[in-house]
A protein has these predicted regions:
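Active-site-flanking alpha-helical
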Residues: 63-71
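Structural preference for long, well-ordered alpha-helical segments in enzyme cores
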Residues: 9, 58-62
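Short pre-active-site segment immediately N-terminal to the catalytic Zn-binding motif
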Residues: 37-58, 69, 97-100
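Metalloprotease/metallohydrolase-associated module, dominated by Zn2+-dependent proteases
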Residues: 1-40, 72-113
């Protein structure tokens, strides 16, 4: 069942714009791709069961909520998938190509993850 972040959670993420804290919906899911603890699609933060209280992961996914809002669906996906594809094209393995995506790098810096 999707849920909003509660007031204490919102207060703890002062680096995230209020608009995105209010828009975000956290969904605990039983399964994601192996090795993935969280994934964001627009305002929907999908967190693997057992990670729904991981503050650093939530902060990371909240950065993606902001990115989706600022860029919109088409631009976000074009930048994200384009960067991943370029990394793979240039011979990077999956993990290295993922880590080289600028949107992921920004989320890691802001969240400390």
């Amino acid at each position: 069942m999707p849920r909003r972040l509660d007031a204490s959670e919102r207060a703890s993420f002062d680096q995230i714009p209020t608009t995105d804290l209010e828009r975000a919906r956290l969904v605990c899911v039983p399964v994601l791709t192996p090795g993935i603890a969280g994934m964001t699609l627009d305002r929907w933060m999908l967190l693997r069961r057992g990670h729904e209280h991981d503050r650093d992961l939530i902060a990371h996914e909240l950065v993606h909520v902001r990115q989706w809002r600022e860029l919109g669906v088409v631009r976000f996906l074009a930048r994200y998938l384009g960067a991943y594809a370029r990394g793979r094209w240039h011979g990077l393995g999956h993990r290295a190509a993922y880590e080289a995506i600028p949107l992921e790098a920004e989320a890691r810096v802001v969240s400390g993850r």
